[in-house]
Amino acid sequence: IENFGKIDGLVNNAANNPKVEESSDKNFSRLENFPLNIWNNDIAVGLTGAFLCSKYYGEKIAQNPDGGSIVNISSDLGLIAPDQRLYKKDGIPENLQNVKPVTYSVVKTGLIGLTRYLATYWADKNVRCNALCPGGVENGQPDDFLREVSKRIPMGRMANSDEYQGALLWMLSNASSYLNGAIVPVDGGRTAW
């Protein structure tokens, strides 16, 4: 703010995507074994962090005559539950099977609630708040995982890392000046089913 005189956009994109350690007799990604300290840390980073940034910078944006935009980066897993079948491996006992940890979806769903709250809170100051809900990005996952997840996406593939930029730039820009409180999935159609 000191360098530019004002702030007119905020992107809340901090999150943990927990990779939880296993032991010989437990898989800590599983709900019944999930450590409370990891729960607290993931909520603090992903949800409390977005709240604090929105609280501080949203007030600054609200002081601008033209307002501005807050975009919370949620996920398709904030709209739908993770398909835990994607993480299963043959020959591994149930209690040791990997799953998508609970906190990722909880944080991403919480961001949708925060988005809706903020969309109404500062609307009279022309501060818009929307959520971008990207699907998964292909980034070196095992071939069997990519094959299975692609079957669940109408476009038949995961996203490339640069395929969310256009939607994010649009949501931050004046081209979306009447978009407020929107939850925008960019997921190849995965949540359309």
Predicted region positions:
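Catalytic loop of short-chain dehydrogenase/reductase
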Residues: 30-36, 71-124
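Amphipathic alpha-helical dimer-interface segment in Rossmann-like NAD(P)H-dependent oxidoreductases
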Residues: 15, 36, 41-65, 77-81, ...
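Catalytic Tyr-X3-Lys loop
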Residues: 8, 16, 27-51, 71, ...
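A conserved structural motif in NAD(P)-dependent oxidoreductases
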Residues: 153-164, 175
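Conserved NAD(P)H cofactor-binding loop of Rossmann-fold oxidoreductase domains
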Residues: 13-27, 189
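Short, small/polar-rich loop/turn modules that mediate ligand/substrate recognition or access, typified
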Residues: 123-128, 179-181
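Conserved amphipathic alpha-helix within the SDR
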Residues: 1-5
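Short C-terminal tail/terminal secondary-structure segment
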Residues: 28, 89-92, 151, 169, ...
